[in-house]
């Protein structure tokens, strides 16, 4: 081997070692060795939550690794996660996201830090004022349940696919809070919203990996590849729908009669004169509520139905408790759950066993 070849090999090895070790210092949590460019991703399976669990057994509940271009710290137990999320330092979100936000949301950092705390505080108070968790909201939810039951009765006990009707029903509960109305399942607007929510979740899942390779994402976007264009079209369709709703609410806004979340937010814009409270941010907030409050509930209900079918003994005990506490002469109320420990335990165990979001959103 000549000296030039030896020098090149030595330099190459040094560069590789430097690349592997960069980003990790004495204050960083322990973690596995990362490869250049791709980090630890090549060693991960299709179930990253299980991969993280295995790494936690080696490096402890808090460890670090590189995911593509990003250095990440993983919290893999309840106590460290709770401690971290209690700190304002973990409120922020990474700048890369599969979902497009309005430039006003990005510029004012409305979804990060202190501005986000204000958005969250206002939203929680607004939902309380609208009756969230109170008898008024219960009555609206009961109306939706009755419509869902009537729809299912039409199947005449024949095998049926429930995903679409559950999606419409759970989304309607969000629509009542946000828009002030619900939509029948065959309403074209209902079908449009269902399409946007369903496709947005599906397309986002396909392009999420690009978050870890922002340089590659820019190249793919430049050549209109990678699926982001489809997601962008879906997001634009949903945003157009929401923008029309906001415009309609502005025309009929009455300070003495706050009908829904959009009404409340529009009035808050007038009061605050805060750039983080504006109509583009409102549109993004609406998208967040539909995205987080529709698919998650729908998926939980699907698992619940499947589990009840798979475990008829459990289903029978749940039905017995329902009959004893509620009977079949009326619809349930929220306070009934205080007398239904078995049913509540079944739901809680299902959410633990079939976790629908095993890895939390990046922070």
Where are each of the predicted segments found?
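Terminal signal-anchor or tail-anchor transmembrane helices
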Residues: 1-27, 172-173
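Transmembrane helix-loop-helix
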Residues: 135-156
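Conserved cytochrome P450 catalytic core segment spanning the I/J/K helices
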Residues: 128-135, 157, 208, 230-301, ...
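Cytochrome P450 substrate-recognition site 1
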Residues: 25-44, 50-140, 161-162, 166-173, ...
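Cytochrome P450 catalytic-core helices
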Residues: 296-314, 319-321
